[in-house]
């Protein structure tokens, strides 16, 4: 038996099929994965993502420390509530993790992947020398993500009336501290929505209120197909500590300016850019298969520039055909995959397929 969130019994009561996910007993679905996927694309669904690790960083050097630790620049977080997506790199310029960092009244809050929790904490502590900072994991905090076109309206049905205007007024990648809740306009589905971070002792009450309001529970199976349609990476699949962010469609998570800011992995990234400019660094692209078949992680690819591999692949419930993320030689123009002995052409597109329920690639 693995670790369980405070909502484990609620998942069982809702008919969830439980699977192991990085040492956690998590609901993969409550019935039909496709129906859950479509629920988020057309209405509203709630995900229990309390398995993710919350780490609070405080102290007088917290900002200075995070400017060194992370590839993106927390100096951009110029007001409480703002959020930033960042890579955390090792000294080789490879991805130790991807995470979201929030500016809080007490300092900063990081939400990192559960599978990398131990590694991330060790790395963070290892790099505190010379900084007056405190690092505190918050295992008693729950995270519920509510996403879909109806999500904001549904959330406003279950919170205090005097909080609704603040929630409706939230900009993307902004959050607000409302009593015991921190509520942010962030997510992993390509739909609008919010994420609640709050004491796990209150999780059952909020879960019940959301379900009573008509929000449906969604498992990690649909969460994966939703994030894939949105072209969002999954750590350990689309990138890991052997992967440059430049080979994982993550350059937007790196702040090269101001030039005098040093951060872990920066010198190596300069070398990666030179490799890319010389055509020697692969890139992460989207693939579209409009004929029958399903693209799967690990399938090998052949392009006009060499070989590649699928890092994430699935049937797309929204598009009604298979899509994938793949790492292939840069500037490839054509691509083929072996599907059960049949060499099949797939189309190369930008790694972003669906946003707000609509196809976004050409």
Model regions and ranges:
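Short, charge-rich binding segments
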Residues: 76-79, 87-94, 99-104, 126-127, ...
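Generic hydrophobic, aliphatic-rich segments that mediate packing or membrane embedding
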Residues: 51, 61-66, 84, 95-97, ...
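Acidic active-site catalytic centers that drive phospho-/nucleotidyl reactions
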Residues: 48, 98, 195
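Membrane-targeting and insertion segments and their boundary/processing signals
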Residues: 36-40, 91, 98, 177-184
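Conserved, structured C-terminal
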Residues: 1-22, 27-28, 104-362
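Acidic, proline/glycine-enriched N-terminal capping motif
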Residues: 1-89, 94
């Amino acid at each position: 038996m693995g670790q369980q969130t405070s909502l484990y019994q609620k998942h069982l009561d809702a008919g969830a099929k439980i699977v192991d996910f990085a040492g956690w007993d998590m609901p993969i679905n409550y019935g039909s994965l496709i129906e859950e996927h479509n629920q988020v694309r057309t209405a509203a669904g709630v995900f229990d993502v309390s398995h993710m690790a919350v780490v609070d960083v405080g102290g007088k050097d917290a900002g200075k420390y995070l400017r060194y630790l992370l590839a993106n620049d927390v100096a951009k977080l110029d007001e409480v509530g703002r959020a930033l997506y960042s890579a955390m790199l090792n000294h080789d310029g490879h991805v130790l993790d991807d995470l979201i960092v929030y500016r809080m009244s007490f300092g900063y809050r990081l939400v990192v992947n559960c599978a990398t929790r131990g590694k991330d904490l060790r790395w963070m502590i290892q790099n505190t020398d010379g900084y007056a900072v405190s690092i505190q994991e918050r295992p008693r905090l729950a995270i519920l993500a509510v996403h879909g076109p109806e999500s904001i309206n549904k959330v406003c049905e279950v919170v205090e009336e005097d909080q609704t205007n603040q929630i409706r007024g939230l900009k993307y990648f902004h959050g607000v501290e409302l009593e015991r809740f921190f509520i942010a306009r962030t997510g992993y589905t390509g739909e609008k929505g919010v994420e609640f971070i709050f004491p796990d002792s209150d999780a059952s009450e909020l879960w019940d209120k959301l379900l009573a309001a008509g929000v449906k529970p969604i498992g990690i199976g649909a969460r994966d197909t939703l994030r894939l349609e949105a072209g969002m990476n999954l750590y350990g699949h689309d990138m890991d500590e052997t992967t440059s962010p430049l080979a994982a469609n993550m350059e937007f998570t790196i702040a090269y300016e101001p030039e005098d800011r040093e951060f872990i992995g920066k010198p190596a990234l300069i070398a990666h850019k030179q490799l890319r400019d010389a055509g020697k660094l692969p890139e992460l692209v989207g693939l579209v298969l409009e004929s029958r078949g399903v693209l799967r992680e690990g399938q090998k690819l052949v392009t006009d520039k060499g070989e590649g591999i699928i890092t994430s692949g699935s049937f797309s419930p929204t598009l009604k055909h298979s899509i994938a993320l793949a790492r292939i030689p840069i500037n490839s123009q054509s691509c083929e995959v072996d599907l059960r002995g049949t060499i099949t052409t797939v189309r190369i597109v930008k790694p972003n397929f669906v946003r707000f329920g609509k196809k976004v690639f050409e």
